[in-house]
């Protein structure tokens, strides 16, 4: 870890008695948010991290090789396939960031999303991106080979709340001029909440309904017993008081 620190930061750490493990980790952001892009697209990678007053430089790594750029933003004006790979950054008062993957593809269309794994009820944002933003019309988003959404003019496709049924293979197609073009297929996975999943796996579908009915029945019986006991309590109390009164009138107590 020490060899990854900038020289000035290393001196500051030694003088302050700090350890490299005490430093926060830098974070890399993509702008725009898509990590899959087409050739000729512009991409900006931004590094978020702490800087010392003496050193505001940033170190960038592409596939573990140091990049000459030392600014907080690394700009790729026209992406090429060899720009694909892992990017990391580090500032003078931060440790090396986790890697961010960039994929540069060749083709007319590319289906884009911030990621491909979502939780139930999360929103999904899909974009049918054309090479050099060429005009695209009559766009269809397809799931498992079936049309899911159609737009006369190219538009992004939103799924407000994902369900398990939204899992599957997706691609988009449309017209560039009179040319029919399609994107590659990608897989989207919707994961289930662990608590719901554990209940569903414990009780097979046919037994889940029976389980609910049993729970309702037990609740009804329990409620009936509660009111029955509550109703009998005053009567028992009166009997006890009558018994106590008769006992106090015993001739031996006079």
Curated annotation (Swiss-Prot):
- Topology relative to the membrane, per the entry? Single-pass type I membrane protein
Q: Please state every residue range assigned to the domain named Ig-like C2-type.
A: 24-105, 107-189
Task: Report the record's Gene Ontology biological process terms.
Answer: antibody-dependent cellular cytotoxicity; calcium-mediated signaling; cell surface receptor signaling pathway; Fc-gamma receptor signaling pathway; natural killer cell activation; natural killer cell degranulation; natural killer cell mediated cytotoxicity; phosphatidylinositol 3-kinase/protein kinase B signal transduction
Keyword flag Glycoprotein = yes
- For the site labelled Important for receptor turnover, the residues are 222
Q: Which residues lie on this side of the membrane: Cytoplasmic?
A: 230-254
Tissue occurrence: Lymphocytes and monocytes.
Q: Which residues form the signal peptide?
A: 1-20
- Gene Ontology annotations for the cellular component aspect, listed alphabetically: external side of plasma membrane; extracellular space; plasma membrane
User: Which positions, given as ranges, span the membrane?
Assistant: 207-229
Q: Name one Pfam family in it.
A: Ig_2
Keyword terms, alphabetized: Cell membrane, Disulfide bond, Glycoprotein, IgG-binding protein, Immunity, Immunoglobulin domain, Membrane, Receptor, Repeat, Secreted, Signal, Transmembrane, Transmembrane helix
GO terms, molecular function = IgG binding; IgG receptor activity
Per the UniProt record, the site (Cleavage) maps to 195-196
Q: Point out the glycosylated residues in this chain.
A: 187
Q: Which cysteines are joined by disulfide bonds?
A: 47-89, 128-172
- What compartments host this protein? Cell membrane; Secreted
Which ranges of this chain reside in the Extracellular compartment per its record? 21-206
Regarding how it is modified after translation, the entry says:
Glycosylated. Glycosylation plays an inhibitory role in the interaction with IgG1 and IgG2. Undergoes rapid ectodomain shedding upon NK cell stimulation. The soluble form is produced by a proteolytic cleavage mediated by ADAM17. Repeated stimulation causes receptor shedding, a mechanism that allows for increased NK cell motility and detachment from opsonized target cells while avoiding activation-induced NK cell apoptosis.
According to its UniProt entry, what is the function of this protein? Receptor for the invariable Fc fragment of immunoglobulin gamma (IgG). Optimally activated upon binding of clustered antigen-IgG complexes displayed on cell surfaces, triggers lysis of antibody-coated cells, a process known as antibody-dependent cellular cytotoxicity (ADCC). Does not bind free monomeric IgG, thus avoiding inappropriate effector cell activation in the absence of antigenic trigger. Mediates IgG effector functions on natural killer (NK) cells.
SUBUNIT field: Forms a heterooligomeric complex with ITAM-containing signaling subunits, either a homodimer of CD247, a homodimer of FCER1G or a heterodimer of CD247 and FCER1G, to form a functional receptor complex. Interacts (via transmembrane domain) with signaling subunits; this interaction is a prerequisite for receptor complex expression on the cell surface and intracellular signal transduction. Binds the Fc region of antigen-complexed IgG with a preference for IgG1 and IgG3 isotypes. Interacts with CD2; this interaction is involved in NK cell activation and cytotoxicity.
What protein name does the entry list?
Low affinity immunoglobulin gamma Fc region receptor III-A
High-level lineage: Eukaryota, Metazoa, Chordata, Craniata, Vertebrata
């Amino acid at each position: 870890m020490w060899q990854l620190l900038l020289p000035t930061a290393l001196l500051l750490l030694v003088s302050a008695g700090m350890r490299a493990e005490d430093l926060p980790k830098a974070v890399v952001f993509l702008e725009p948010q898509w990590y899959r892009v087409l050739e000729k697209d512009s991409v900006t990678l931004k590094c978020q991290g702490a800087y010392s007053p003496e050193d505001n430089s940033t170190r960038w790594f592409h596939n573990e090789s140091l990049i000459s750029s030392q600014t907080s933003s690394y700009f790729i004006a026209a992406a090429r396939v060899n720009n694909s790979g892992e990017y990391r950054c580090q500032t003078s008062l931060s440790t090396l960031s986790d890697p961010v993957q960039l994929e540069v593809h060749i083709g007319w269309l590319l289906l884009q999303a911030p990621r491909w794994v979502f939780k139930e009820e999360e929103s999904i944002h899909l974009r049918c991106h054309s090479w050099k933003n060429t005009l695209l019309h009559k766009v269809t988003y397809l799931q498992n080979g079936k049309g899911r959404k159609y737009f006369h003019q190219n538009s992004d496709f939103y799924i407000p709340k994902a369900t398990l049924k939204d899992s599957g293979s997706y691609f988009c197609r449309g017209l560039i001029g009179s040319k029919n073009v399609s994107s590659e297929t990608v897989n989207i996975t919707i994961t289930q909440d662990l608590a719901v999943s554990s209940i569903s796996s414990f009780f097979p579908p046919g037994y889940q309904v029976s389980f609910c009915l049993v729970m309702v029945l037990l609740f009804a019986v329990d409620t009936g017993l509660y009111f029955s006991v509550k109703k009998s309590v005053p009567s028992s109390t009166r009997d006890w008081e009558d018994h106590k009164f008769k006992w106090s009138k015993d001739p031996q107590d006079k």
